[in-house]
């Protein structure tokens, strides 16, 4: 007697695929990340931040273009991730609550279905960093379905005031850790940085930084690098900036990083989220 055949409808097949796809993607990412070079052990690891405590950055998002790590981002709503506009508006995969490129530790995988770039953003070409002195460098990404909020995944609070010079803040990322060659950390690295005044920033980047940008850095060797583009600047557990651009060498205390200042864009962010 023949065993009965199982027939799957198109709908049930799609549901099964949707359940399997996140696991498959995670396995492929792990295989891809395993090929990334290890950190340079000749360098002082304390000079480039330290590993973030597990689950301490539940708003952190890694954005992938296929299997390639593309940019960082931050969860600002159950259905929305904020990142830098220069990361491009192609469909991406978002790993929300991610703190390790190799391990699955409670993050949630979502496809982005829509991108909303700030209407005044135009990729520029400045005198210091060609194509990296862009004003209004913000983009909101809508997730295919809302994330489930909990201890490992939660939205970062938007600012009720602007950060002030001297404020101590934190950045986290998987970015380059040495100027000699580009490489990624597998684990999320946290670094402490200080908000600079506009006058201090002008010394480093004369005539380049606008009132919609904010500089932070100067703590020894802890500036984030360009491969952390789109990552959050967090001050007192509120979002104050999105990493827009900086100057090589990575980890150089001589050049602060430049962020899009989130407090200047609250109306736009809230309008996009409410209307979509």
UniProtKB/Swiss-Prot annotation:
The active site is at 86 (charge relay system), 137 (charge relay system), 229 (charge relay system). One of its GO terms (biological process) is proteolysis. InterPro entries: Peptidase_S1_PA (IPR009003), Peptidase_S1_PA_chymotrypsin (IPR043504), Peptidase_S1A (IPR001314), Trypsin_dom (IPR001254), TRYPSIN_HIS (IPR018114). The lineage of its organism: Eukaryota, Metazoa, Chordata, Craniata, Vertebrata. Keywords: Cell cycle, Disulfide bond, Glycoprotein, Hydrolase, Protease, Secreted, Serine protease, Signal, Tumor suppressor. Expressed in breast, ovary and prostate. It comes from Homo sapiens. Pfam families: Trypsin. It is found in: Secreted. The keyword Membrane does not apply. Glycans are attached at residue 39. This is Kallikrein-10.
